[in-house]
Design a protein with these regions (language model features):
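Short hydrophobic core segments
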Residues: 10, 143-154
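Conserved N-terminal/central alpha/beta ligand/cofactor-binding core
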Residues: 4, 21-125, 140, 152-169, ...
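A glycine-rich dinucleotide-binding beta-alpha-beta segment and adjacent secondary-structure elements
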Residues: 306-372, 400-413, 539-593, 598
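An anion/pyrophosphate-binding glycine-rich loop and adjacent beta-alpha core
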Residues: 36-38, 54, 182-320, 408, ...
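Beta1/beta-strand and adjacent pyrophosphate-binding region of the FAD-binding site
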Residues: 2-15
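Conserved beta-strand-loop-beta-strand element in the redox core of flavoprotein oxidoreductases
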Residues: 127-143
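Internal hydrophobic alpha-helix adjacent to the cofactor/substrate pocket in enzyme cavities
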Residues: 378-399
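Extended, charge-enriched "interface" segments that sit outside catalytic cores
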Residues: 430, 436, 447-617, 621-625
Length: 625
């Protein structure tokens, strides 16, 4: 038995799995400690991956050489591309996943990753000497040593669940909470706070009247998260269903509010703004006559279904009575109630951009303990933390992504620069350069970085190069190919499009909003021939990327120029150069915020809430710029 490792990862949730896999694949001997090896990468809440902005993060994880996209594709039971009615910067992939298959796929990957080992136990304390982490002690009394440690404890640190007046210690239903680490880190100067999240009731589909629900099928043109074309789901595809609350449901819930832990003072922590409980919806939107709910399958062959939109900590009798007033649930049976959970998290402004803590060297935090919510946000942090835990051991440079390079970069920069006062969820609106951070080109942006690290394989890198070579050739063909009116006008007349007065380049036709490359291929044999010559497994992906490149070329070029201009401030280092409390030309708020955050660069300083443009100019003047 080995007790000495390069990297130890505490917690095998979505952050921990990515961290452990990354560190081990980069060459560090890695130990993953988890309370239950049968619940690795457990989907604690909804059985889905992706969504608005979250789907882009999963694509970025995959492009870098992470695993979440592969696991999701292999366990997918429904796929949808959200926001297709909007521009491509807003397109967001989302997949329903088989919960059990998701765990099995992750465990298979971890158990077959060289350098990676697992230990089932609970970590109770860290070994820290002279401000440097040296190892981990467990509940079984085992001591492991490590050169770096990644803490990804999720909701388990002093977790407390609520169902009405009933309170149960735990990190998840039927799983114990973790004690000891929070108290140790608080004594070392870490700022510890509490947050709250929740999950809805699980229902038995055999007792649902689907004739009173609206079906929601997945996309027929099935996409995938992974850029590897060989990764596919072999599972049966299943639909979701839509139902609505009504006045009877609302009346029962309102009468039960005095028993709600959220409204009687039992829960004092702040919950996620963008995933409110059903009782919060009623209080916040008292005039709304109904709320939409989604009934989502938990897997390919299970009868268990997740009621998205009905998160609650009300007493079970109130939850059930309200549910039964929804026509589709008149005779419903449940598997378990919804519940709320409070847990500890640490102020993320006490982290560097590589997710190493400022107070303890070689100790990294990732996931919900940094104040985020969501599997995808956790996994993205876990990947970065795992990479940097390895880099700390190997003596390599820290791996940091910029705001113009990845949503993961936006996420981490927001956390360490602005901090959080409520659970942080990623949105496309948080990214000022979102047209540069599309889901379709995550491989072009990030696979070269993953390849340089040694995380993305040669196969992945070659696939990325061949794809974008094909995209560029298709764009060049569009620029060079002349379309004659004698060819296209009869086709346009049949389709009801305005005819051309004179010939033009194919590129100019693709620029038209109502015309797609695939539609034009039906009218132009030479274009059809070009498309059919493309690799079949990636044909749609290549054509889609070429079309986006053409239609949005002007916007993309303009945004790249803006990002390049702003990036100059990211290269002006200021950490350690000033004692901010002595710079009286700065505002009082600016001095306080700069002292607390201790930004790495002027660019980061400019994004701290309360730092004005004049404060930034003062810093630049003091630097002689």
């Amino acid at each position: 038995m080995n007790y000495a490792y390069d990297v130890i990862v505490i917690g095998a949730g979505h952050a921990g799995c990515e961290a452990a896999a990354a560190a081990a694949r980069l060459g560090s001997t890695t130990l993953l400690i988890t309370m239950d090896m049968n619940k690795i990468a457990q989907m604690s809440c909804n059985p889905a991956v992706g969504g608005i902005a979250k789907g882009q993060i999963v694509r970025e994880i995959d492009a870098l050489g992470g695993q979440m996209g592969i696991v999701t594709d292999r366990s997918s039971i429904q796929f949808r591309m959200l926001n297709r009615s909007k521009g491509p910067a807003m397109w967001s992939p989302r997949s329903q996943a088989d919960r059990i298959r998701f765990i099995a796929e992750w465990r298979n990957i971890l158990e077959n990753t060289p350098n990676l080992y697992m230990w089932q136990d609970s970590a109770v304390s860290l070994t820290i000497e002279n401000g440097v982490v040296k190892g981990v002690k467990t509940a079984f009394g085992v001591e492991f040593t490590a050169k770096s440690v990644v803490l990804t404890a999720g909701t388990f640190l002093n977790g407390l669940m609520h169902v009405g007046p009933v309170q149960i210690e735990g990190g998840r239903v039927s799983e114990p909470a973790s004690h000891g680490i929070t108290e140790q880190l608080r004594d070392l100067g870490f700022t510890v706070q509490r947050m709250k999240t929740g999950t809805p009731v699980r229902l038995d589909e055999r007792t649902v009247d689907f004739s009173k629900a609206t079906i929601q099928e997945g996309d027929a043109d099935f996409h995938h998260f992974s850029f590897l074309p060989t990764v596919k789901s072999e599972l049966k595809q299943r639909p979701c269903w839509i139902v609505y609350t009504n006045s009877e449901v609302h009346q029962i819930l309102r009468e039960g509010l005095p028993e709600s832990p959220l409204y009687n003072g039992q829960i004092k922590s702040i919950g996620p703004r963008y995933c409110p409980s059903i009782e919060t919806k009623l209080v916040t939107f008292p005039d709304k006559e109904q709320h939409q709910l989604f009934l989502e399958p938990e897997g390919e062959n299970t009868h268990e279904m997740y009621l998205n939109g009905f998160s609650s900590s009300m007493p079970w009798k109130v939850q059930f009575e309200a549910l039964s007033k929804i026509p589709a649930f008149a005779n419903v049976q449940a598997y378990r109630p919804g519940y709320a959970i409070e847990y500890d998290f640490f102020d993320p402004t006490q982290l560097h951009h590589n997710l190493e803590t400022k107070l303890v060297k070689n100790l990294f935090f990732a996931g919900q303990i940094n104040g985020t919510t969501g599997y995808e946000e956790a996994a993205g942090q876990g990947l970065v933390a795992g990479i940097n835990a390895h880099q700390a051991v190997a003596g390599g440079e820290s791996f940091v992504l910029g705001r113009d390079e990845a949503y993961i970069g936006v996420l981490i920069d927001d956390l360490v620069t602005k901090g959080v006062d409520e659970p942080y969820r990623m949105f496309t609106s948080r990214a000022e350069h979102r047209i540069l951070l599309r889901q379709d080109d995550a491989d072009r942006r990030l696979t070269p970085k993953g390849y340089a690290l040694g995380l993305a394989t040669q196969e992945r890198y070659d696939l990325m190069r061949s794809k974008w070579d094909a995209v560029e050739k298709l764009v060049e063909f569009a620029k060079e190919f002349s379309v004659k009116t004698s060819l296209i006008n009869p086709e346009f007349e049949r389709a009801g499009f305005p005819t051309l007065a004179h010939g033009c380049k194919l590129y100019d036709l693709i620029l038209r909003p109502q015309l797609s490359i695939f539609l034009l291929a039906e009218m132009i044999p030479e274009l059809q021939k070009r498309i059919l010559e493309l690799e079949q497994a990636r044909r749609e992906e290549i054509v889609e990327a070429a079309e986006i490149s053409i239609k949005y070329n002007g916007y993309i070029a303009r945004e790249e120029a803006i990002a390049k201009k702003l990036s100059r401030l990211e290269h002006v280092k200021i950490r350690g150069k000033f004692k901010y409390s002595d710079i009286h030309s700065l505002s009082t708020e600016a001095r306080q915020k700069l002292e607390k955050i201790d930004p790495e660069t002027v660019g980061q300083a400019s994004r701290i809430p309360g730092i004005s443009p004049s404060d930034v100019n003062i810093l630049l003047l003091l630097l002689g710029r």
